Each structure stands twice: as C-alpha cells, then as structure tokens.
C-alpha cells in the first residue's frame, strides 16, 4: 500500500512547465500529426505548396470540418492580418493552442467527474505526469482532439449515471435534456474526427440507453443533437471539398454530398486496404500498446475497486472494441490515459512505495525519447534550408512535412518519379529504401540546384564521404526504425552532393 506524501501543487505546477517545454520541442512522432492537420490546412488557407494525403483528395475519407474548427481560426487570423510568421512559428502556436485546450478541458473534466478531493488529485496528478499528456497530447494528432471530445462526453454520461443511481428524488427528477443534446453533438463530432470514436462509448453508453428508456422524450434530444450536428458537418465538408454545385443540381442525391466518415468506414472495412497501413495481431492493443502507455502504472490499474466506475468501463470498452480492428497503433489509445489514471488504486496491500518512483523514471525517459529525440531533426532541418532552392533527398526519416518550408513552389516525389525542376524546392522521399537505390537516385538527378542528402548521421556510413560536403546537422535526432547498436550515434545530417 502506498500513502502519497507530496506537495501536489508544486508537482502540478512543474508538470505545466514541462508540458510547455515539450510542446515547443521538435520531435516527430508519426506522419499523421502533420499530414492530417496543417499539411492540409496551410495549403487551403495560406496557399502553401504541400503534399496532400489521399484521405483528403477524391472521395475523401477524412473530414475537414474538425480541422477547420480547431486550427482554422488561427490560420485565418494569420492570413487576415498578414502576419509575417514562419511555418515553424505557426506550428509552435498551433501546438500551444492544443496544449492549453488539453490542459483546461482535461483538468476540468477530471475534477467534476470524480467524487472526492483525493480522487481528483490522484487522477490529475498522474495524468499530468504521464508522457502521453506531456508529449503525445501536445502534437497535432486527431487522437489529441479525440481525447478532449471523449472526456467531455464521458463527463456528461457519468452525470446521467449519477442522476439514475441517486437516492435523492429531487436529483432523479432533474431535467437532463440539454445533457443528452450535447452528448449527441459530441458523438457526431467524435465520429467526424475519428470513425472509431464510438468504440470508447459502447460500454458506458449503457447508462445513456437506460436513461432514454425511462425518459423517451429525452431520447429525442439525443437524436436531434446527433443528426443536426451530422447534417452541419456534412454540409461544411461538401462546401470545403467543392461539391456544393452538385448539391444544388441534385439536392436529393446522396452521392452529391461528402460523407467522409462513411467513406472512411468503407475503405477500412476492406482488409487489403488496412494491410497497406500495417496489420497487427489482435492482442497488440492489450499486450503491447496499453502497457507502453501506462508503463508501471499498469500495476496500479489492476484492481477490483474501480471496475464499476464509468472511467474504467470506458477504458475497457476502448481496449476491447478497438482490438477487433487488425490495424492497431499506440496513439489510437491515448484518449484512455486520463480515464485509466482515474482508476489507479494505491490501497492494494502488495503495492510498495518504491513502485511510485518507477512511474517517474518511466515517464521522464519516455518524455525525453518521444518528446525531444524521436525523429527530432526533421522539422529543424526543413526550417534551416527552406530559403534555398534545392533538391533534398531524404533517407531513413519520416516523410518530411513540406508545409514547414512555407513555400508555394515545392514538390514531393518518391523513388523512380520524375522531378519537376521548375519548383523552388524538390523533396525526394526515399523512406527506408536500400542504400544502393538512393545512391542511384543521387547519380541520376539532373539539376542546376544544389542537391542535399539528408539522413541520420549513423546511416551516412553507407555513402562515399568523398562525394559529399557536410553542411549542417541537428544533434537531437534518433531514428528508432533503423537502430544500429554498433553505431547508435544520434543526429540528422545534411550533406551536399559534390
């Protein structure tokens, strides 16, 4: 059993400082944090030349509406006032925005959801000290938005549960129509943000169903909230994707409208489509991803004391139903972190005081690894060489987000594709190709612009050093996908082809 003795306010304030430190760090966790956010919006609003992913092209499988609601005001503000900001500065501001939103909404929901001060302090403290909150939640993932939508939805559902289980007749008679309307709104927003959002709500949704079965009229408010929001989001997407003329011509033809979640569902329902993004064993979320999220916190989570609570049921719901889908990435589970922290139990007799320190060590290590080092040189390198016309050959890095260049004349190609030399900057994304293929590409590039090879310093040994001149390097970069324990030197280098 652990008795937590600390000045929690001091720790809490310290985590706020760390949150902003990691928000302004340059790590790059997954391509989707760029390619499903500002890579798309800066092209549409600021006219940047970017690499638009397939999800936002023909038959779009991603909704633009949530992105415009979250990041649109910032970008339109910059455009309207003609602010002379670099793309890197815009990135920092957008991340600060999501960081502050996360901080306010998460703490608010946990405070009002939990029944006592010790429970509130526990949940907020462990949520705030987790590397998921300090790092992942401050990146521009759709999962970061999903966390906030889920917390508010669960707060509303838990309130409905409280009304039903209260022994106070006055509480039972409270009108919760607004609550149900907002729940419908949030479910719709959650689905348009990520199609898997309902997976988190299947088990806690039982309390909504119980309430509606006793209050039939209230069910209409839930339906109205959901369908009115859905109709609005479909209309917004239809306008943004340029299909409004089809709607005017054929308003009763469903195919005239852009229904992004439906397109996403149809795409992901095909196994061969999921296989392009990676197939994982069905146990990956439960045995790999959740332990990686909680770390030593998994010890505190295994308890019978909280199994009937709404946060615990939400965690189990998300774990079970997302595990049915064979494509399983860690970030899909990050909305569960705050709710799992609500269910930590320190009253267990076998839990020892030293176990608490393993939580600190684990989260400090993971925060530095994922918040500073992981692919940490990609964005700084793009920012460093953005002002020079060039051909950039990237190897063994994540796909460089071209919007960081802040240019309206950029093109991204892959191995074997022809370069358009009229562009100011050409990016050749070689991903993890064989080094011989990269060498061949370097030999065949015909241009008057300087040609740069950008690769982890540890990987440069695959090339003839005499053919290159080192230009610049960024130390805080670690490539976990191509680790060579014989040479684990960190850093991302820029080498000019001679």
Curated annotation (Swiss-Prot):
InterPro entries: GPI_mannosylTrfase. It is found in: Endoplasmic reticulum membrane. One of its GO terms (biological process) is fungal-type cell wall biogenesis. The chain crosses the membrane at residues 11-31, 63-83, 96-116, 140-160, 189-209, 222-242, 247-267, 282-302, 310-330, 332-348, 350-370. The keyword Magnesium does not apply. Its EC number is 2.4.1.-. It comes from the Eukaryota. Keywords: Endoplasmic reticulum, Glycoprotein, Glycosyltransferase, GPI-anchor biosynthesis, Membrane, Transferase, Transmembrane, Transmembrane helix. GO terms for molecular function: alpha-1,2-mannosyltransferase activity. It is an enzyme of class 2 (transferase). Its main location: endoplasmic reticulum. Pathway: Glycolipid biosynthesis; glycosylphosphatidylinositol-anchor biosynthesis. Alpha-1,2-mannosyltransferase involved in glycosylphosphatidylinositol-anchor biosynthesis. Transfers a fourth mannose to trimannosyl-GPIs during GPI precursor assembly. The presence of a fourth mannose in GPI is essential in fungi. This is GPI mannosyltransferase 4. It comes from Candida albicans (strain SC5314 / ATCC MYA-2876) (Yeast).
């Amino acid at each position: 059993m652990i008795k937590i003795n600390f000045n929690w306010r001091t720790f809490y304030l310290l985590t706020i400082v760390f949150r902003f430190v990691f928000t302004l760090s340059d790590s790059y966790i997954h391509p989707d944090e760029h390619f499903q956010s500002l890579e798309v919006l800066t092209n549409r609003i600021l006219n940047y030349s970017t690499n638009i992913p397939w999800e936002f092209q023909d038959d779009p499988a991603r909704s633009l509406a949530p992105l415009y609601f979250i990041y649109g005001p910032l970008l339109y503000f910059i455009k309207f006032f003609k602010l002379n900001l670099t793309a890197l500065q815009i990135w920092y501001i957008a991340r600060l925005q999501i960081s502050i939103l996360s901080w306010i909404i998460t703490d608010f929901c946990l405070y009002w959801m939990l029944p006592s001060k010790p429970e509130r302090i526990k949940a907020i403290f462990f949520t705030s000290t987790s590397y998921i909150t300090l790092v992942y939640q401050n990146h521009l993932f759709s999962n970061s938005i999903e966390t906030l939508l889920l917390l508010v939805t669960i707060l509303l559902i838990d309130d409905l549960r409280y009304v039903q289980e209260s022994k106070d007749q006055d509480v039972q008679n409270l009108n919760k129509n607004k609550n149900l309307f907002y729940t419908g709104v949030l479910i719709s927003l959650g689905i348009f943000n990520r199609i898997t959002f309902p997976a988190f709500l299947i088990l806690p949704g039982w309390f909504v169903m119980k309430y509606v079965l006793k209050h039939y009229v209230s069910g209409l408010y839930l339906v109205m909230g959901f369908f009115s929001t859905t109709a609005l989001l479909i209309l917004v997407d239809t306008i943004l994707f340029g299909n409004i003329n089809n709607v005017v011509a054929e308003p009763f033809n469903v195919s005239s409208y852009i229904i992004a979640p439906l397109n996403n569902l149809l795409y992901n329902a095909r196994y061969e489509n999921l296989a392009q993004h990676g197939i994982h064993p069905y146990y990956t979320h439960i045995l790999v991803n959740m332990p990686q999220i909680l770390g030593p916190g998994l010890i505190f989570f295994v308890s019978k004391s909280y199994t009937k609570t709404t946060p615990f049921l939400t965690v189990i719901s998300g774990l079970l139903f997302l595990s049915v889908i064979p494509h399983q990435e860690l970030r899909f589970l990050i909305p569960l972190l705050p709710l799992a922290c609500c269910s930590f139990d320190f009253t267990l007799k076998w839990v020892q005081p030293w176990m608490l320190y393993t939580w600190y060590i684990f989260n400090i290590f993971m925060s530095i690894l994922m918040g500073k080092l992981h692919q940490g040189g990609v964005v700084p390198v793009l920012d460093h060489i953005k002002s020079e016309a060039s051909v950039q050959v990237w190897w063994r890095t994540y796909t460089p987000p071209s919007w960081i260049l802040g240019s309206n004349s950029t093109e991204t190609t892959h191995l074997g594709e022809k370069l358009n030399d009229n562009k100011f900057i050409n990016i050749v994304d070689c991903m993890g190709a064989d080094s011989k293929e990269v060498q061949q590409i370097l030999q065949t590039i015909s241009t008057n612009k300087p040609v740069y090879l950008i690769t982890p310093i540890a990987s440069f040994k695959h090339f003839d050093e005499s053919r290159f001149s080192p230009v610049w390097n960024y130390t805080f970069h670690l490539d976990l996908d191509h680790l060579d324990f014989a040479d684990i030197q960190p850093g991302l280098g820029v080498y000019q082809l001679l």
